[in-house]
Regions:
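Aromatic-enriched alpha-helical interface/lid elements that frame and gate functional surfaces
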Residues: 180-262, 269
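Oxidoreductase and adenylate-handling cofactor-binding alpha/beta cores
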Residues: 119-139, 152, 156-164, 208-215
């Protein structure tokens, strides 16, 4: 019986199993390669080469083959022989360092940015290689490391590092220095009864109308974006007092209809 993980990722796909440690398995594999456009592999570093099935061997069988490889840390560098999994890629790619709250440890991100993110980057590389093959008829070896994929997905934090000259701290749910720009509790106070509100400066007046406090536009504490940042604890408390009296979907509708970006924090059951 196939695992749930296997069926989730391989629905509507045909598959077969080959033992590549046997002569028959290698022979059948090479027959498939001869008729294939793309080979995707994520074996441990050097595994296919040790079996005699590396790129240099297979391109002699099929010169148009796109040989696509995923490795934890790529072919070169001090960690090229090291194995990797999702959390390792997140740790080494910088994602964990900017995830979590300032007073807590680096935090693992549950959406699989290391696994799925690397696969998406590789798919783009494969498509580019196929496009080039239309011109010269030749395949190529395309490689993406899990660390590199996570680094690319952390590009905003890397940009901010370059601008500030130091590593970016963890900010919890606060997005940059925009206030309001975080999660707020909602009624009835369940585990996921929260909304995320991101009211940009041009939306400030509309936001105040929604929460019924237009007079805050005249409050010096909140008159500018910089002032709102300096007084964010006071403003967040005001917003939370309003959201906590309302269902998260009610808050989302009210904000959305006023042109203020807002999302209800849905659990997996609500998403499905």
């Amino acid at each position: 019986v196939d695992s749930l993980y296997f069926t989730m990722l391989n629905a509507n796909k045909r598959s077969l199993t080959l033992n590549l440690k046997t002569d028959d398995g290698k022979r059948l594999f090479k027959q498939l390669v001869a008729e294939s456009d793309v080979l995707v592999e994520n074996f441990s570093p050097g595994a296919l080469d040790r079996m005699g099935l590396g790129y240099d061997t297979l391109k002699e069988i099929n010169s148009g083959l796109i040989y696509a490889t995923i490795k934890g840390f790529g072919t070169f560098g001090p960690y090229s022989e090291f194995k990797s999994f999702e959390p390792i890629a997140q740790a080494m790619g910088g994602a964990m360092s900017v995830t979590g709250f300032p007073d807590g440890p680096p935090t693992y991100v549950w959406p699989s940015i290391g696994d799925s993110g690397t696969g998406m980057h590789l798919a783009i590389g494969i498509l580019a290689a196929l496009q080039q093959r239309h011109g010269d008829g030749l395949g190529q070896h395309v490689e993406v490391s899990m660390q590199d994929a996570v680094v690319n997905l952390c590009r905003v934090s890397l940009r901010d590092h370059q601008r500030a000259g130091h590593a970016m701290p963890r900010q919890g749910n606060q997005l940059g220095r925009n206030v309001p720009g975080t999660t707020y509790p909602c009624h009835p106070g369940g585990t996921n009864d929260y909304v995320y509100i991101f009211a940009q400066p041009q939306m400030w007046s509309a936001f105040l109308e929604v929460i019924g406090l237009p007079e805050l536009a005249e409050d010096d504490r909140f008159a500018t974006l910089e002032a709102r940042w300096d007084n964010r604890e006071a403003l967040d408390a005001i917003v939370a007092a309003w959201t906590s009296q309302r269902d998260k979907h009610e808050v989302m509708r009210a904000m959305g209809e006023a042109g203020v970006p807002c999302g209800a924090c849905q659990d997996t059951g609500e998403v499905l």
